[in-house]
Each structure stands twice: as structure tokens, then as C-alpha cells.
Amino acid sequence: MSFSVRLTEVAEGAHAYIQDDGSWFVNNSGILVGSRQGLLVDTCATVNRTRELLSTARGIGLPPNPLVVATHHHADHTNGLSLVEPSAIIAHAEVPGEMAAAFAIPPPGLFEEVEWGEIEVCSPTLTFEDRLSLDLGGLVAEVVYCGTAAHTRGDSYVYLPDSRVLFAGDLVFNGVTPFAAMGSIPGWIDALSSLAELAVDVVVPGHGDLCDASVMRSVGRYLRFVEEVAGGAVEAGVSPLEAARSIDLGEFAGWLDAERIVGNLHAAMAGLAGSAVDLIGVFVDMKEYAGGRPLRCIA
């Protein structure tokens, strides 16, 4: 099986592994190779996709048993961890608990059929609260917690200060609709403000093509748009699905996975009400918004 992937050198010893088209469960990774150690930033959703990632990484010098940073707990970024045989799995302290409560493979019927393979869930072996500095040998990688619940409760990013490269994880989507149902929209907006203070020339988003720091403004505009719609929906007494169906997505209409507007409205409206997000309701309503069919997934 072949996949559409692109490998781009973003700094000496650092490559972005971009999987097209960045939609549901099709994420990006990073491959860092120093003189002393190698590091992967995230794995992939399926066994076959992770094997492709590892084959590519080894072809450019990734040594056996590298470090792996899991930028957050979601399955598209962590399902392949067992295949890597890492020396350590690094993640924020919130991630082990979130992994234990999440699904590695979504329930049948929510998404189009995917050949996931035999998934073995691997929890992080090295957690941190704020940040870690990793000297790989001629290549320093800063692993930093975003400071707040955002896309999830445990998002971190990998920053290469010497080359001004940011592996943003799912704090940044480029041309793909962000998804906040397991995090916090106000927190995500705050996290983007913090990211914008970094000196960055190249951003490797969690999903979508390589970009520059202006992408953070685009994601921020979308999240503020969701907040505005949610406020109106609460005032009008309509449901997230009803609100989503009533609006024009405007500049965001061309982004992939547009049905996430429903899940994001669930999150924003629950936040305004001080209640928990009904994740089952989120996926049921997104599927309904998409015409009642399983959600498109090419993973």
C-alpha cells in the first residue's frame, strides 16, 4: 500500500514528514537526527502508515530506538508508538490519563472503513509538566507544554530555536478545520498567542502543508468565529447542530473536515454553560451534518 507523503528538510538534521491530505487521522510527523540521538515527533494512525514513516526515517539516518515525542494523546499521533521501539516516549503529564480514556480505533460506523492494523497502545514513559530540552548532538529540541487545555488537555510542541522551526502538533492546522471537542477554545486561543511570541520561520502543522507563522492567525480567527456563533446559539436557544446548519463558514468553507464546526460548537457552548462536552453527541451530530454517512477518512 502506498500513501501520498512528502519529506522536506526544514533544518540541518530535521525533516517534516507531511501526509496528504491532512484530513481525519492523516497527520504530520517530524524526524530529527543528531550526532548522539534521534527523535520522532509523533507517529501515525495505522500500522501501515507508521511503517512507511519508519522506513522513510531510517532512510535518512534515524537510529534504532529513538526518542519519541507524543505531542498529545490522539490516536493519529500515537497509534504507531509500539512499532518504533523507542528508548523513551515523551509527553506532557496529562497525556497518559487521556490516552487511557480515549479510543485507539473509533467505533464502527463513525468513519469510512480504515485498515488500522494491530494497534498496541503504548503510554508515555517520560512525562513533564512545563518543558524539556533535548540535546540530540548538534541539534537542540525544546519540548514545551502549551500552558493550558487547548486542542486537548496535554498539548505540547517541539521548537528548534537555532533554526526557528516549530513542530506544532495539533495546536496548528493548515487548510484543515481545527477540532476542539476534547480541549478548550479559550485556552487554544491563549496558546496560539504564546506560540506567536516565538521566533519562527517554518511551522510544521499537525495536519496540512508546511506554512509560516501567519497560520496561527488563521486558526485563531476560526476559533473566535466559533465562539461568536456559540454565543448567538446559546442566546437563541438552538442546538450546536442547528447553529452549524444555519451559518455560512465564510473564509473557512474550503477547509477540510468542515463538519468539525458542529463538534467545536458543542465544545464552545458547553464551555459557556459550564458543562462537560457530550463526545458521543459530538460525533453523532457531525455525522448528521455530513449527511448521515460515515465521515470521510483516508487513513
Positions of predicted regions on the chain:
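Divalent metal-coordination and catalytic microenvironments
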Residues: 13, 32, 42, 57, ...
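Active-site HxH/HxHxD metal-binding segment of metal-dependent hydrolases
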Residues: 48-51, 55-133, 153
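C-terminal regulatory/interaction regions
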Residues: 238-299
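Short Pro/Gly-enriched beta-strand edge/turn motifs at strand-loop
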Residues: 10-17, 112-116, 137-144
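Metallo-beta-lactamase
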Residues: 37-39, 43-47, 133, 140-232
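Basic/polar N-terminal segments that are highly enriched at the extreme N-terminus
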Residues: 1-12, 297-299
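Conserved beta-strand hairpin/beta-sheet module of binuclear metal-dependent hydrolase folds
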Residues: 7-56, 156-169
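Acidic/histidine-rich helix-loop elements
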Residues: 21-22, 102-108, 115, 176-182
